[in-house]
A protein has these predicted regions:
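Helix-start/capping segments and mature chain N-termini
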Residues: 1-19, 23-31, 36, 42, ...
């Protein structure tokens, strides 16, 4: 919920009612031992030209998905490929998860080979930034190394947990 709150703040959206959202997630997940819930929080209906209504009436959509099955790739390392599509860089949107992921959509469309699990994306200047659907971390000795997210990329939940454990 902290990531959602930060994204709302940075996108100038009203904060969700965390208690209500938590209860809705629990109700949606009832009866499922393991599941994934995706929360979409939007500005709601807008006027022409992207003008937001006043007052803003956000929409929320909760989607329940199956817990992904374990694969050989989960044990690593992942077979990777380098994508031709470069990441757009925008510090205002860096680190938060939002619905504008067209760079990743285009990059992921570059291959259909089932033997490749992920595509590595570069920034406009050729720096390694992220995967099409993942953060990149490299373990070197006792240290974890990950690209800077100052201008692009998502500060993923698992990335944050791994970096905390590495401190």
């Amino acid at each position: 919920m902290a990531h959602l709150a930060d994204g709302c703040r940075r996108l100038r959206l009203p904060q969700p009612d965390v208690a209500l959202l938590t209860n809705e997630c629990l109700a949606l997940a009832a009866g499922h031992a393991r599941a994934v819930i995706k929360i979409y929080w939007t500005a709601g209906d807008s006027k022409r030209g992207y003008r937001r209504p006043t007052p803003l009436r956000p929409h929320r959509i909760l989607r329940l998905g199956a817990w992904p099955p374990a694969t050989d790739s989960d044990r690593g390392p992942w077979p990777l490929r380098l994508c031709d599509q470069r990441m757009s860089e925008n510090p205002s949107l860096a680190q938060i998860k939002h619905l504008n992921r067209l760079d990743q959509v285009l990059a992921r469309s570059e291959w259909s080979n089932a033997d490749v699990d992920e595509g590595v994306m570069l920034g406009q200047d050729g720096r390694v930034l992220c995967g099409t659907m993942s953060n990149l971390l490299i373990q070197r000795g006792d240290s974890l190394i990950t690209p800077s997210l100052e201008s692009a990329g998502i500060a993923g939940v698992v990335r944050g947990l791994l970096l905390q454990l590495g401190e």
